[in-house]
Amino acid sequence: MEMEEVIAEVLQKIVPTEEERAFVKELIGELEGIAREKAQELGLEVKPYFVGSLAKDTYLAGDHDVDLFLAFPLDTPLEEVRERGLELGKEIGKTLGEYEIAYAEHPYVRAKYRDVKVDLVPCYDVRDWKDVRTAVDRSILHTKWVNENLNGKNNEVRLLKRFLKGIKAYGSEIYVRGFSGYLSEILVIKYGSFVEVLEKADFILRQKVVDPAGWLKREPEIAMKTVRREVEEDKPLVVIDPVDPRRNVAANLSWEKYGRFYFKADEFLQRPSLEFFFPTGKTGGDYLAELRRKGTHLITLLFDVPEMVDDLLFPQLERSARGFEKALSREGFEVLGWNTGRYGAEKAFVMLELDRVERPRVKIHPGPEFFTERGRDFYRKNERVWLVGKRLYAEKRVKENIIDVVRELLEKNQVALGKNLRETVKGAEILVDYVPRPLENEAYLFLSREKEGLKH
């Protein structure tokens, strides 16, 4: 297919219909009315703001998640914003029907209304970046800036978002580390169109710094401080927030996700296809056959997790997986990859691909110099001891089975784990070359590299 044909067909699928737009407009009107009514009942001077893709008209067809921010006056103490904001969110949630409390920088309410997810988030009613008190305050400014600068390129943003979703590079959550919706909007505003953003994938990376609002001229000291900080942390991009020179919009973007965009952008420009937007790749397969093909082994730990949102859980799962990777490497096992996720509502898993599940019965254990106190202690404690020069060496018996090795590492606290997972991981069920049926496809996608691979 020609590129124009591909884009036209994608737009048919992702641009909301008039009927859908009417539903969204009605939904927003109802929610705003409820929010104002409840704020008035509680005697709160709060302004409701709709932010995010719905408020900017950059949402994809069928994606109606609502972000409703409850903005308090700037002179309100932070603790009051948290407490009264949560109280207001609960009252709105009760009216909507069902809700739960979620936690980020401060608690907020997640509700559901007419089959649409609604986040009710307390914030400050900020006018510019100098007013920002909490991380969420900027969202009001983001929505205003995009609406003032998008100039009818809404569908170009939709194309970029759908493309990024299709290549698994969309979402700024800490467990995704991809492109946020706001970053997508900025790139389209800066470079003109979906195709032009793709054409500049290499240029953007080499340029490194994107400054759409000209902060480097307006606030050079603050903006340069942001640039230096992000460059020192080896971030792929520094996109100075158009509404706040202190912030890098691409701060959560990983090298891996930009790398996916880098290659897939070029592939699409060379060979346009719907597959980039709506992939039909494998969703599962035979993980045991994959293990036989590779000659490797799969270790899976299943454990209970405390109740927490994914934004908090997934970084801790990742930290735990990296902890196992380092600890097992020290023990002589080669960890070829790891994978984490939820398993049902109350459990999580860590998968580790290893070169083997057994190791030699003995290991050469280097000791201290023989004429030291530690040397004499080493000589007393070990059976087979010899000298190489002035240094002592011994044969040390080691655990052979991977399960025993993992258990011992956990018992001795030699694995760096997520802070809320330390106790539960110690009681994990450890499976070797086997996973429960609900995780079979997940195991296959991990082992085959279908999940994160660039080429298969």
Curated annotation (Swiss-Prot):
Keyword set includes ATP-binding: yes
Record's keyword terms, sorted: ATP-binding, Magnesium, Metal-binding, Nucleotide-binding, Nucleotidyltransferase, RNA repair, RNA-binding, Transferase, tRNA processing
Cofactor: Mg(2+)
Gene3D superfamilies (alphabetical): Archaeal tRNA CCA-adding enzyme catalytic domain, Beta Polymerase, domain 2, CCA tRNA nucleotidyltransferase, domain 2, Poly(A) polymerase predicted RNA binding domain
Catalytic activity: a tRNA precursor + 2 CTP + ATP = a tRNA with a 3' CCA end + 3 diphosphate; a tRNA with a 3' CCA end + 2 CTP + ATP = a tRNA with a 3' CCACCA end + 3 diphosphate
InterPro entries: CAA_C (IPR048833), CCA-adding_arc (IPR008229), CCA_tRNA_nucleotrans_2 (IPR042090), NT_2-5OAS_ClassI-CCAase (IPR006116), NT_sf (IPR043519), NuclTrfase_I-like_C (IPR011068), Polymerase_NTP_transf_dom (IPR002934), tRNA_NucTransf2 (IPR015329)
UniProt cross-references to SUPFAM superfamilies, sorted A to Z: Nucleotidyltransferase (SSF81301), PAP/Archaeal CCA-adding enzyme, C-terminal domain (SSF55003), PAP/OAS1 substrate-binding domain (SSF81631)
Record family assignment: Belongs to the tRNA nucleotidyltransferase/poly(A) polymerase family. Archaeal CCA-adding enzyme subfamily.
Protein name per its UniProtKB record: CCA-adding enzyme
Organism: Thermococcus kodakarensis (strain ATCC BAA-918 / JCM 12380 / KOD1)
